[in-house]
């Protein structure tokens, strides 16, 4: 990663040298480098989850299930009672529609899914083995680290908080750059980062939780 960043700095600097426009060179280099580090480094934790733990594929799937549980719970509760209990919005200047009620619901939604992790894990493991039955092999390891009680609450709280932070940071970046969407790759869905902004912050959280906390 360090070598890649150095190479990127050299290329970006050379590009600025040969540009006719000489203003805002540092700003352009800084924005580009931030984008490279922000997206590539944070999202690279998906590979760490996949390859550093038994059944990494299943762990990645379950991580995205937690993100979706957080997003869906926050959205539904926010639409239903957002602003009715807590009058102050979560971050009114950055994302006016986000409510404190929705944020709390996101944490609770993640917590409930984590408590069902053992059943979900076995379901996915059996599904993977069912697919691999045609090749008469099953590479799934059924060893599972139960996450319950205080650990489950800590993980749910961390995912709920950092999923919201991921959304807010991406919204802040778009407002700073005065763009509506983060790209046009996913038409009708706001852009690539609009779909994965939560994941960028949550993937590292889950990785370090599994590495340093889950097995305690």
Model-derived regions, located:
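Membrane-embedded alpha-helical bundles of polytopic integral membrane proteins
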Residues: 1-157
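Acidic (Asp/Glu-rich) catalytic motifs at the cytosolic membrane interface
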Residues: 67-83, 87, 91, 96, ...
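Short, conserved aromatic-histidine micro-motifs
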Residues: 126-136, 189-191, 196, 215-216
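A generic structural signal for well-ordered alpha-helical surface patches
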Residues: 151, 171, 206-207
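Juxtamembrane boundary at the C-terminal end of a transmembrane helix
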Residues: 208-216
